[in-house]
């Protein structure tokens, strides 16, 4: 395990506090957004980009590992009835985060 991020108190952009300057994070396979967050967006008028900065959007924990061990971690999570999936990857590049969701692509 190279890193773990609990996505509350910093939401989907929290990871940017913990990666080096040459890490470009791509999250392009996010979990479906629970209805609660859609209701918050609708009632508040907040745009989707800010929603991903403020709320975890139903995506609570990230574990950063090498691709070859990801399936085993997902299997262990599922044994405890915890949904898990690969949500993205890291590339070499300038420190940044790209979130690709059903509501658009957001750069941070």
Regions found by a protein language model. Name each.
Residues 1-108:
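Glycine-/charge-enriched secondary-structure boundary and capping motifs
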